[in-house]
Amino acid sequence: MLGGDVPKAIAYLEKGAKLAPDNALMRVRLAEAYAAANRNAEAQKTIDDLLAMKPVAGYEPEYNEAIAAAKKLQEKIK
């Protein structure tokens, strides 16, 4: 996403989210990619899905990082 191909990033992140639906960091990165592509409704839906998730045991720090980033992004796209 940093100077890269946003549509390609979205495609990879969508595949990753399907393969690892419990990966909170993958979901927040997907939301960020949607926002970068001005697809704010999809970014918000992804954030809503993330906020509804429960952390996977052993991955609480990553989950908390993703939640913090999601809330920050949510404020930015409103």
Predicted feature residues:
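Canonical positions in the second alpha-helix
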Residues: 15-16, 50
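TPR/TPR-like (Sel1-like) alpha-helical repeat modules
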Residues: 35, 40-58
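Structural signature of tandem alpha-helical TPR/SEL1-like repeats
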Residues: 2-12, 39-45
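Helix-start (N-cap) detector for alpha-helical repeat units in TPR-like alpha-solenoids
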Residues: 24-25, 68
